[in-house]
A protein has these predicted regions:
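Short His-centered aromatic/hydrophobic patch
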Residues: 112-115
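Conserved N-terminal ligand/cofactor-binding loop architecture of enzyme catalytic domains
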Residues: 20-100
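Extreme N-terminal starter segment of soluble prokaryotic enzymes
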Residues: 1-4
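Donor-nucleotide binding loops and adjacent catalytic segments primarily
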Residues: 192-193, 201-244
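A short, glycine/small-residue-rich beta-strand->loop->alpha-helix junction that serves as a flexible
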Residues: 7-19, 218
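Proline-aspartate-enriched helix->loop->beta-strand connector
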Residues: 101, 105-107
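Active-site-proximal region of nucleotide-activated glycan assembly enzymes
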Residues: 126-188
Length: 244
């Protein structure tokens, strides 16, 4: 059985979830039967730029505008109006991704991004490929963009995500609450004092971890300053990904 794991590099979360699934699968099946790809590598340059770069720009610099369109397009009536043109745009810009899937003909496609759901489901509806399509939803709250006819199973973060999907019209029998995929490395127990020593931390101080995702999205610097101004003894570890 051949497995294809697909993500889109619009932020780092979709990629990390896909990599976690990849790591877990490699513990169970032969390496030659598992492939992992970034679907945006199989699109045209302009589409990739919009998806991967402008997304981060909007979230960081124009969060109110981003939020407005996010919630607007999550209204059932509005989404129904844009569903077909959205599908056309995805299909037209993802021809090379379609070709990759048809050439490799996986038995199972596991997607951590809704764009891949749309493309693979389109191939299934047109009887171009016969495979299982599993969607690992990387958001805690559901958006209509994740809802695609042709997805066989949804693996979701929490019970609330499951309820959201059911509210979107998905059968409860297709939804499994598994949590967001994380690397098997996080299941390994480590000695806290050894880790603090490795990073040059004071073993006697309370330690807080601030995570801004793979691209340092959000007011991370402001948050650090405000916590640093508190009259308490603590030390901070800050993960800001590629944001230098």
């Amino acid at each position: 059985m051949k497995y294809l794991i697909v993500y889109a590099s619009a932020g780092a979360g979709h990629r990390k979830a896909a990599e976690a699934i990849h790591e877990a699968l490699l513990e169970r099946v032969d390496k030659k039967d598992v492939a992992i790809i970034d679907s945006l590598d199989y699109t045209n340059a302009f589409f990739r730029w919009i998806y991967a770069r402008k997304y981060i720009t909007f979230v960081n610099d124009l969060p109110n505008i981003w939020g407005f369109f996010y919630y607007l397009l999550n209204i059932r009536l509005i989404y129904r109006l844009i569903r077909f043109p959205r599908r056309v745009v995805n299909v037209l810009n993802c021809r090379r991704f379609e070709d990759f899937v048809l050439k490799n003909r996986p038995d199972v496609v596991i997607s951590t991004h809704f764009m891949a759901n749309e493309i693979v489901a389109h191939l299934k509806r047109n009887n171009k490929i016969n495979c299982r399509l599993y969607s690992a939803v990387t958001d805690y709250r559901m958006h209509f963009f994740w809802v695609t006819l042709g997805v066989d199973c949804y693996f979701v973060a929490a019970e609330q995500t499951r309820k959201d999907l059911i509210g979107c019209g998905i059968s409860k029998d297709k939804i499994f609450v598994t949590g967001i995929p994380i690397s098997p490395k996080f299941s390994v127990s480590l000695n806290k004092q050894d880790v603090k020593s490795k990073f040059g931390l004071d073993a006697s101080l309370f330690t807080a971890l601030i995570i801004g995702g793979g691209f340092g999205v959000g007011p991370v610097e402001e948050l650090v300053k405000k916590i640093g101004a508190l009259k308490i003894d603590l030390q901070l570890l800050v993960v800001c990904g590629y944001n230098e």
